[in-house]
Swiss-Prot record:
Superkingdom in the source lineage: Eukaryota
Native organism taxonomy: Eukaryota, Amoebozoa, Evosea, Eumycetozoa, Dictyostelia
Family, as annotated: Belongs to the ubiquitin-conjugating enzyme family. UFC1 subfamily.
Protein name, per record: Ubiquitin-fold modifier-conjugating enzyme 1
Keyword tags: Ubl conjugation pathway
GO process annotations (BP): protein ufmylation; response to endoplasmic reticulum stress; reticulophagy
Source organism per UniProt: Dictyostelium discoideum (Social amoeba)
Active site location: C115 (glycyl thioester intermediate)
Amino acid sequence: MDNHTKQTVQQIPLLTVKAGPRDGDKWIDRLKEEYQALIKYVEINKKADNDWFNIESNPLGTRWQGKCWYIYNFKKYEFDLEFDMPVTYPETAPEIAIPELDGKTEKMYRGGKICLTIHFKPLWSRNVPHFGIAHALALGLAPWLAAEVPHLVDNGIIKHKEDK
């Protein structure tokens, strides 16, 4: 993990409520913590002029969707993102999907779910219940985009909307 990512993650609040979508009122308490951590992460990114996603959930906090983007060669590549909260959350990290990239890279599972098994999942499991959605974005999706978008562009697999 690079120093910038480490410093950013250290500023994201750690969560304390160990609850998943089936845990009733405890889940509501967990969602409050999730939103507080996400708001802080967005503030950190905006302050660093590194705004790269927006996200929202359904009323129950079980289905999340939004947009993420990556700037490469002065062009903005924007993608839809989505994930469902696993029933076993927070023990199991959410599987973030970028459906439009499904099948375009080997670092992705069926349905456009990004591959996070080698580096991210062990880190997540060591930090249950303290890591949440903001941490999954910072430590999972952000590095994945940084590695994969340039590769996909340079190999002609994806094109910028202006180049189509």
